[in-house]
UniProtKB/Swiss-Prot annotation:
Interacts with the MHF histone-fold complex to form the FANCM-MHF complex. The gene is MPH1. PROSITE patterns: HELICASE_ATP_BIND_1 (PS51192), HELICASE_CTER (PS51194). Residues 879-890 have a biased composition (Basic residues). Residues 189-199 have a biased composition (Acidic residues). This is ATP-dependent DNA helicase MPH1. The keyword ATP-binding applies. Keywords: ATP-binding, DNA damage, DNA repair, DNA-binding, Helicase, Hydrolase, Nucleotide-binding, Nucleus. Residues 675-846 form the Helicase C-terminal domain. Residues 331-499 form the Helicase ATP-binding domain.
Amino acid sequence: MADDGCSGLSDFITDDELFNEVTLNEVSDSQTGRPTKRRRLNSHEINTDSTGRREIEEAGTDSDTFDPSLPPNSKTTGRGRKSNDDNPAARKPKTYTPKYHVDQKPLFVTQTQPSSSPSRIRGPRWKAPERNKPSTVSKAKQKSPLPAIWGRKPSTIGSHGTNGKDIDAAIAASLRSFEEEQSARGDAEMLDDSIEEPGDTQVHATPGPVTNAEKETIFDFEDIPDDAFDFEPEFTETADKEPILISSQPRPSQNTTRRPTASQSTSFRQTTLLGGFASSSSKRSSQPATQTWPSSSRNEPPTHHELNKDALRTWIFPKNLGSRREYQFNIAHRALFHNLLVALPTGLGKTFIAATVMLNWFHWTKDAQIVFVAPTKPLVSQQVDACFHIAGIPRSQTTLLTGNTPPGVRAEEWRSKRVFFMTPQTIMNDLKTGIADPKRIVLLVVDEAHRATGAYAYVEIVKFLQRFNNSFRVLALTATPGATVEAVQEVIDGLSISRIEIRTEKSLDIRGFVHQRNVETITFENSRDMITSMELFAKALQPVVDRLRNQNAYWGRDPMALTPFGLTKARQEWNSSPAGRAASWPVKGTINSMFTVLASLAHAIDLLKYHGIGPFYRNLVSFEDSVLKEKKGGKCASQIVADGNFKVLMSKLRSWTNTEEFIGHPKLEYLRRAILNHFLDAGGKNGGDSEGSDSNTRVMIFSHFRDSAEEIVRVLRKHQPFVRPHVFVGQANAKGSEGMDQKTQLEVVGKFKTGTYNTIVATSIGEEGLDIGEVDLIICYDGHSSPIRMLQRMGRTGRKRAGNIILLLSKGKEEESYSKAKDSYEKMQQLIASGSRFTFHTDKSSRIVPQDIQPEAEEKMIEIPIENSQLGLPEPAKRSRAPKRPPKKFHMPDGVEKGFTKASRLGRTNTDSNGRSKRKRVVRTPSPELEEFPDLGDLCANQSQELADDPDFQEIAGKQIPRLRMDVYPEHQRSLRPTGFIEHGKYTRRVVKTFRKISKLGFDCEAQYRAIVGDPDDDGEGLEGLSTDREDDPQSVTAHQSREQPPRVEKRCGTEELSSLDIEAFFPNLAWPARPEAPRPESDGTDNRDQKPSQRKKRYMISDDSDVFE
């Protein structure tokens, strides 16, 4: 038990003398130069008849949950300890005198000092330790003699002189306290001299000291657990060049499943560098270390995509760019089987990884579709180039669709192509209208994935696809996943991410591909002109701020501390406060107007502080014009403009900005000198006209606002052609500034790469993902509190060669914001790598590939098809007339019952609740085919003959039916008889009209006919001169007869030809009554032959509704 004794007292030794065998020098009070160390012991600690429980407890313990390894309560130790009047022995001090001599300096210890937190050593405080159940090893130790201390024999323990018994009791109590602490934590005891045989669980105590040879062979390596040396240090602040351990880097434990051995025990535990004990139950990474893919216990339904079994045997890694990079190889392999979020610094090949994954899924499936989405068209075009010239995806199978493509053309492309490069809004519209089939999509690649928060189109696309398709892969690419834990978790939830692969510039596997970037931070004080402007502007705004303070709506006093966000929050709080709710409408309107005016002017304050006098002056000019000319802002704005301080300020600003050489901010002067020095150091003297000039070096400047970007360009243009700057902004038009469409943006980027421009001043449009080219110097004109934007800016340089970054910050808020962004980025990288704060969606990440298939990597050169050498993007050709938009199509998820379902059948499957099967649908027998129709002429002739010969047609019930006669009831034939429900038809009216005309014909109709038409035997000579008048009234006929010119024959049609027939021959039985002639209308003597048909008077107009006859 000698070894156990050393282990038991090892906690009393400091860190710098751990496990050193020492002996205390036997010195007396007269030999030492300092007083002896005194230790005060309670009476119950040295009581010989005390049980093991009382010996463990220190004096003054409050409860049973007190940990004996911790320092005692302050009320019971030291000077503040209360005395026990009932036990006078407790007041008597005990002197501890060392008896053993050592070569080292004497060491005096009074109590154990654990290096870890109490909850980590003894467990939670609400759980009392199980002290009544000592382990078997503890009992064996109690029966064995006390171990040798510092190499001495056990017999020497009792030789302490006068106080020997007290010292022995104190040491024994300390040993038992340590043993009880170990058993209370449930951990195994420290190593003793017992050797455990395989399969034997009994402890064999071997008394006596342990030699050094025995110590070397005492370990049984089979008893060491697999994770004994899987130590993962906590993240601490490291130097810039110190690597950061990340969870996604390969570890042996992540590729194999741990299998415990037969003799595995808990006799060993891992010690941290700080002296504590590592906790094996803590969650170490976002990816479980013991899980292999695919999981044998996870049963997934087979995919509905048609897979290519031959191609699934391998997965292709292109070598067109040269030697492979291990991090790209590992990330691409994991992206084939997981919904992966890839976080890589800019310029490290995220586009190549996406092209590799797209190529493999293109070969693995036969007709499934692959979609790549990016927020802007320039980002989409970058991926198109990688897929064509690196992955070798055929151009004929790809297309680029944006909102400018007509829906009819997009529908045709969705039916014929397999690889699509789109903007997120376009694909979302195609999915909603049914143009795109969500069930055919097998891979969705998302660029700039940090945007996938809230209701952005990325999130809506994934949600829509999951409604119809449970077998598709998601690959998300970004350089900065998020600024907070909540933002990263929102991205994980929105895209159903199951794994994260993250790398930083300090990661071991990418250090060889990241060039050094020197970051230089420069801070600036406000200039005299800026201070003067701030003072005048503050005096102009002070009355408005005081009015808000008097209304308890705003608590700030300094107008220069106004911010748009602060004013917005103050307005919301005042409106929701009792004072705001109880205020009258005029008061509310006045206060809200003041908040609005101050919020607009707070932006001008930011421009003055961080961007200079020029942008500040232009903002105030716009504000002044809106008040004086457009009459906006109300009384509050008019009061500010009319203030004397404001007028003095505008006068000074106007005089300063009219000076050509005026520079409104110290940042701008430093920026100008830094750019000139950079080009001079690069060897350029003639602006790139000679060899060795600055034609190979580029500078990029980032500014948050367009006003400051244009101010920078104005200053730099004075040094042309040495410095050739150009502004680079977004598409939207701003007040006083025009936007740049995507075509213009690509042209500017192309000229920047070729050297036409060597300096670009960009807003946020140049931050995300755009391949600007090789930039040697990055200047951030203003700091930003967002780590995403900060890292996007810095990632523009240091890709193929070393780069420099200059940060221009104003002292105060801007400097603090940058520091906060930097710390937030580093902390987020650690949290993402650990994965301990995120929840991943492994249940929504199906493998798609069958579990019995394990594709093997195949590295090879990809043969690029000849069709990929064509210039331009694979956009559909423009047509003179676009195809019609197809009707909206509703896609249904699998297993959905289509059609109408009764309420009684809801929730039922093939059988009802009683076990009865559904009623089978009645199948109707097909009706016999119809015979061909006979010829209509033959049919009519046969029917007429049959009716004439059929006696049944003429007789009903033995009575003969008279034949139809047209000569009876003539009065009824010339009138429309009353009807009940159905009106008279068109043909009925015509027949009645015809009979009316016939009835009006007199007995002299033949003579009248001959007079008008002429002799029927005439050969038609002289017909050219006949009249073509269509009037039929007798007066008109008489007028024509009186003319000397020969009459003209007028062709008549219809029933009017009946006037020349002999009516009596047709109706011999009719008695024709003598009818008086109708009065003829007097002629006005005008000739109607030249009138238009619509202007002529119509004769014989019969009302169809008239039933009255003469």
